[in-house]
Swiss-Prot record:
Residues modified to Valine amide: 17
Entry's localization field: Secreted
Name recorded for this polypeptide: Bombolitin-1
Record-linked Pfam families: Bombolitin (PF08096)
Summary of the function given for this chain in its UniProt record: Mast cell degranulating peptide. Its mast cell degranulation activity may be related to the activation of G-protein coupled receptors in mast cells as well as interaction with other proteins located in cell endosomal membranes in the mast cells.
Length: 17
């Protein structure tokens, strides 16, 4: 797993909320 992917996923989740 890449850290960038994790950050991107977290950012998307945060943006969604």
């Amino acid at each position: 797993i890449k850290i960038t992917t994790m950050l991107a996923k977290l950012g998307k989740v945060l943006a969604h909320v």
